[in-house]
């Protein structure tokens, strides 16, 4: 089984003046989370979707799933206190319902510009190498600074990548490291890749696209709108 685990547990504090969590903001009468879910719904290799949602909005999400005919979502469950805990909750639900050898693609509900090719590459990488993290090369230079804002090192861009999503693993492996982290009282994982590498797993790079952005601010939302408008214009005018 190939299962998408979609994290929609944030409340979007960086979205100024918004009364909705960022995943429920609408573009052309369609919420961001639905744009995201449609990509996995339409991918022929995805068998099921589990969504971890901020709890007060679960009923609203279920209404959206019905309205937009999203049929692959099998379960919507409440998130935890942190992103790490929310992902763990979702993984435990997948464990209850699916095989331990399932491939799990962990993706942000506010990353709607994912495409079929990236989804398929993630699945193939897990089956070939046991893991996958979607990345793209940086276009600017990273510098390492100290506590006094003095540059201490300049990273080689050719050896750097921007971490994106999906981040994909066998269910048995990602659950194992989450449980180990809980035993160790480790709660500071930035994402699934950082948790896997902390506990000694190699994570294989998968090529992504720069427009696969995470919508966390008003600027991100306007970039998303511009990309959607461009895609629509290309379909109409060629």
Swiss-Prot record:
Q: In its UniProt record, which GO terms are filed under biological process?
A: isoprenoid biosynthetic process
Tell whether Nucleotidyltransferase is among the UniProt keywords.
yes
Which EC number(s) does the record attach to this protein?
Answer: 2.7.7.40
For the keyword Lipid metabolism, the answer is no
Q: Where is this site: Positions ribitol 5-phosphate for the nucleophilic attack?
A: 157, 214
- Which keywords does this Swiss-Prot/TrEMBL entry list? Nucleotidyltransferase, Transferase
One GO MF annotation is: D-ribitol-5-phosphate cytidylyltransferase activity
**Coiled coil residues, start to end:** none
Gene3D superfamilies membership = Spore Coat Polysaccharide Biosynthesis Protein SpsA, Chain A
Entries under InterPro entries matching the protein: IspD/TarI (IPR034683), ISPD_synthase_CS (IPR018294), Nucleotide-diphossugar_trans (IPR029044), TarI (IPR034709)
Which residues take part in binding CTP?
A: 7-10, 80-86
Catalytic activity annotated for this protein? D-ribitol 5-phosphate + CTP + H(+) = CDP-L-ribitol + diphosphate
Q: Which domain of life is it from?
A: Bacteria
**According to its record, what are the GO cellular component terms?**
cytosol
Transmembrane segments annotated in the record for this chain:
none
Residue numbers for the site described as Transition state stabilizer? 14, 22
PANTHER family registered for this protein in UniProt: D-RIBITOL-5-PHOSPHATE CYTIDYLYLTRANSFERASE
Q: Which family does it belong to?
A: Belongs to the IspD/TarI cytidylyltransferase family. TarI subfamily.
Q: What does this protein do?
A: Catalyzes the transfer of the cytidylyl group of CTP to D-ribitol 5-phosphate.
What the entry lists under NCBIfam families is as follows: PRK00155.1-3 (NF001183)
Tell me what this protein is called.
Answer: Ribitol-5-phosphate cytidylyltransferase
């Amino acid at each position: 089984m190939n299962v998408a685990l979609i994290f929609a547990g944030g409340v979007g504090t960086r979205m100024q003046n918004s009364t909705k969590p960022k995943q429920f903001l609408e573009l052309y009468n369609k919420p961001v989370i639905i744009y995201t879910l449609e990509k996995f719904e339409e991918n022929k290799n995805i068998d099921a979707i589990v969504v971890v949602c901020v709890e007060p909005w679960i009923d609203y999400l279920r209404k959206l799933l019905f309205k937009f005919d999203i049929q692959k979502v099998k379960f919507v469950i409440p998130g935890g206190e942190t992103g790490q805990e929310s992902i763990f909750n979702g993984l435990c639900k997948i464990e209850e319902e699916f095989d331990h050898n399932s491939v799990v693609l962990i993706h942000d509900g506010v990353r709607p510009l994912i495409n079929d090719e990236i989804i398929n590459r993630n699945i193939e990488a897990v089956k070939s190498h046991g893991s996958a993290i979607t990345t793209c090369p940086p276009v600017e230079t990273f510098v390492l600074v100290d506590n006094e804002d003095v540059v201490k090192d300049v990273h080689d861009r050719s050896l750097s990548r921007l971490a994106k999503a999906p981040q994909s693993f066998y269910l048995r492996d990602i659950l194992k490291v989450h449980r180990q982290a809980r035993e160790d009282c480790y709660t500071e994982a930035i994402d699934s890749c950082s948790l896997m590498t902390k506990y000694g797993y190699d994570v294989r790079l998968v090529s992504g696209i720069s427009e696969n952005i995470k919508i966390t601010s008003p600027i991100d939302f306007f970039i998303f709108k511009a990309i959607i408008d461009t895609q629509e214009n290309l379909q109409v005018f060629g």
